[in-house]
């Protein structure tokens, strides 16, 4: 985890709660009102959950691998991994799905570990394009497969609840590495497996 990804440990829970009270006053509310008395604490605790990815090292989830997989060297795909993130521009939710595929080179990881990598990157302030690349590069760096493909679908509430107010819009991003980028057949097989936006 880079230094810039580390949470600022000098900021206390009390300071976080006071920041919420400031926002409530700025919005025109009274933080001392009965219904809002516990809101600062609840918001601070929610942020601790939503952004727990800053306290994790995604690569660590992939360190335990299975090298005896009966010679399996074909495509492995985990699709429809649900995630919840927040955009770094408006701090608004991004909700969607991630599809991950890789061609192993002797190392296979437990499927739950791929989902944990997704969660670790999603539970941070994000830009969808960056998150897509981070997930793919993490898998490539640790497992060193012949190729990696990652496709991310996301509904951005910064677009649906503010600004242009367009509901039902989904953003799709992809990152292809190794054989997924160089071999059109491998890429096509992966995309057929996940069938983004299509019927299954």
Curated annotation (Swiss-Prot):
InterPro entries: GTP-CH-I_C/QueF (IPR043133), GTP-CH-I_N (IPR043134), GTP_CycHdrlase_I (IPR001474), GTP_CycHdrlase_I_CS (IPR018234), GTP_CycHdrlase_I_dom (IPR020602). Pathway: Cofactor biosynthesis; 7,8-dihydroneopterin triphosphate biosynthesis; 7,8-dihydroneopterin triphosphate from GTP: step 1/1. It is an enzyme of class 3 (hydrolase). Gene3D superfamilies: 1.10.286.10, 3.30.1130.10. It catalyses: GTP + H2O = 7,8-dihydroneopterin 3'-triphosphate + formate + H(+). GO terms for biological process: one-carbon metabolic process; tetrahydrobiopterin biosynthetic process; tetrahydrofolate biosynthetic process. It comes from the Bacteria. Keywords: GTP-binding, Hydrolase, Metal-binding, Nucleotide-binding, One-carbon metabolism, Zinc. GO terms for molecular function: GTP binding; GTP cyclohydrolase I activity; zinc ion binding. Pfam families: GTP_cyclohydroI. GO terms for cellular component: cytoplasm. Zn(2+) binds at residues 87, 90, 158. Its EC number is 3.5.4.16. Toroid-shaped homodecamer, composed of two pentamers of five dimers. NCBIfam families: folE, PRK09347.1-2, PRK09347.1-3. Belongs to the GTP cyclohydrolase I family. This is GTP cyclohydrolase 1. It comes from Xanthomonas campestris pv. campestris (strain ATCC 33913 / DSM 3586 / NCPPB 528 / LMG 568 / P 25). The lineage of its organism: Bacteria, Pseudomonadati, Pseudomonadota, Gammaproteobacteria, Lysobacterales.
């Amino acid at each position: 985890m880079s230094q810039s990804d580390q949470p600022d440990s000098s900021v206390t829970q009390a300071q976080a709660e006071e920041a919420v009270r400031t926002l409530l006053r700025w919005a025109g509310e009274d933080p001392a009102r009965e219904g809002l008395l516990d809101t600062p604490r609840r918001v601070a605790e929610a942020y601790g959950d939503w952004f727990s990815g800053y306290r994790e090292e995604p690569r660590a989830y992939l360190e335990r691998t299975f090298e005896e997989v009966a010679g399996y060297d074909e495509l492995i795909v985990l699709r429809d991994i649900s995630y919840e993130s927040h955009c770094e521009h408006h701090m608004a939710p991004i909700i969607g799905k991630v599809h991950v595929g890789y061609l192993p080179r002797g190392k296979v990881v437990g499927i739950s570990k791929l989902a944990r990598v997704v969660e670790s990157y999603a539970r941070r302030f994000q830009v969808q394009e960056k998150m897509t690349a981070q997930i793919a590069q993490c898998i490539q760096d640790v497992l060193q497969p012949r190729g990696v493909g990652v496709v991310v679908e996301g509904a951005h509430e910064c677009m649906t609840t503010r600004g242009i107010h367009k509901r039902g819009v989904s953003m799709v991003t992809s990152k292809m590495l190794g054989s997924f980028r160089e071999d059109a057949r491998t890429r096509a097989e992966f995309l057929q497996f996940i069938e983004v936006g299509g019927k299954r």
